[in-house]
C-alpha cells in the first residue's frame, strides 16, 4: 500500500488467488488494510470463501449459483443476475478456460531452452491414429468454437445488470501447468489467426 497506494489504476486489492487455510487471518488483513488506506476496495481471496469484510467478491460461484458458465446452448437472452445478487459487487473469475486443439505450426517457435514436447506427443498420437492430415482442421474448428464461447460468455456478463465485471483466465495459452490451450493468442502472445483484435473487442 505504501509503494503503490497512489497509482491511479490501484482500485482493488485482493489478498491472493484461490487461497486456502484460515480465512480469519485473511479477513483480519482486509480489515487492517481498510483502516490503513480506505481509498480502494478490498477482498480476502478469489474463488474460495466470501468473508464479511469483503467489499467485492471475485469467484466462479456465489451462494446463489454459478457466475462463470461452462454449459448451455448458444443464445442471447440469458445473464447471471440471480447468481450475482449478493451483498457486494461480484466479478466473474477466470472466464474462458475453453480448450482448443494445438496448432502444430507453433512448434517451430520454440527455439530456446524450452521444447514443445507436449505438442510433439499430441502430434505423434494423431499420426499413430492416421489423422495427422486433419490437424489443421481440428485446430481451426475448435479455435472457432472457443472464440464463439468467449463471445457468448462475455456478452452474458455484460448483460448482467448487477455484475461487477469479469476477468478472463487469459488471452494467451498457459504452458506453465500442463497444456492449457485456452487463449486466442499462443504462448508467445502472438495471434493464432482465429479472430481479429477488432472483432474480439466487440464483446470484450
Question: What is the meaning of each model-derived region?
Answer:
Residues 1-185:
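Substrate-binding/catalytic cleft of secreted carbohydrate-active enzymes
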Amino acid at each position: 500500500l505504501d509503494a503503490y497506494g497512489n497509482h491511479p489504476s490501484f482500485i482493488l486489492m485482493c489478498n491472493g488467488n484461490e487461497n486456502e487455510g484460515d480465512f480469519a487471518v485473511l479477513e483480519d488483513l482486509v480489515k487492517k488494510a481498510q483502516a490503513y488506506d480506505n481509498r480502494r476496495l478490498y477482498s480476502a481471496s478469489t474463488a474460495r470463501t466470501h468473508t464479511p469484510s469483503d467489499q467485492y467478491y471475485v469467484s466462479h460461484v456465489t451462494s446463489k449459483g454459478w457466475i462463470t458458465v461452462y454449459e448451455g446452448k448458444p443464445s442471447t437472452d440469458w445473464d447471471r443476475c440471480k447468481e450475482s445478487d449478493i451483498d457486494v459487487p461480484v466479478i466473474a473469475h477466470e472466464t474462458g478456460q475453453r480448450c482448443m486443439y494445438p496448432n502444430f505450426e507453433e512448434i517451430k517457435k520454440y527455439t530456446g531452452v524450452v521444447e514443445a514436447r507436449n505438442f510433439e506427443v499430441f502430434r505423434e498420437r494423431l499420426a499413430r491414429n492416421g489423422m495427422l492430415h486433419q490437424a489443421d482442421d481440428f485446430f481451426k474448428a475448435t479455435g472457432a468454437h472457443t472464440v464463439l464461447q468467449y463471445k457468448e460468455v462475455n456478452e452474458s456478463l455484460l448483460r448482467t445488470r448487477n455484475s461487477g465485471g469479469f476477468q478472463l483466465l487469459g488471452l494467451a495459452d498457459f504452458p506453465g501447468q500442463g497444456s492449457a490451450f485456452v487463449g486466442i493468442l499462443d504462448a508467445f502472445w502472438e495471434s493464432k489467426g482465429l479472430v481479429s483484435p477488432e472483432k474480439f473487442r466487440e464483446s470484450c
